[in-house]
């Protein structure tokens, strides 16, 4: 559980601000499916 939470949080946590600012539409969907909401 601890590892799964850290992995899920570390992955979408970085591409969120990086891709979220560049491509909110395409980037948001990419990191969203990565492991955040969807």
From Swiss-Prot:
Keyword Nucleotide-binding: no
Chain residue ranges for the region called Disordered: 1-38
Coiled-coil annotated residue ranges, if any: none
Keywords: Capsid protein, DNA-binding, Host cytoplasm, Viral genome packaging, Viral release from host cell, Virion
Keyword Cell membrane: no
One GO MF term attached to the UniProt entry: DNA binding
Subcellular location: Virion; Host cytoplasm
GO cellular component: host cell cytoplasm; viral capsid
Subunit structure: Interacts with F protein.
Protein family: Belongs to the microviridae J protein family.
Function statement: Mediates ssDNA packaging into virion, it locates to the internal surface of the capsid, thereby displacing the internal scaffolding protein B during virion formation. Protein J binds to and is packaged with the viral ssDNA. Additionally, protein J plays a role in viral attachment efficiency to the host cell.
Protein's name according to its UniProt entry: DNA-binding protein J
Gene coding for it: J
């Amino acid at each position: 559980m601890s590892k799964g939470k850290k992995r899920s949080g570390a992955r979408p946590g970085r591409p969120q601000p990086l891709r979220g600012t560049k491509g909110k539409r395409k980037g948001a969907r990419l990191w969203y499916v990565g492991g955040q909401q969807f």
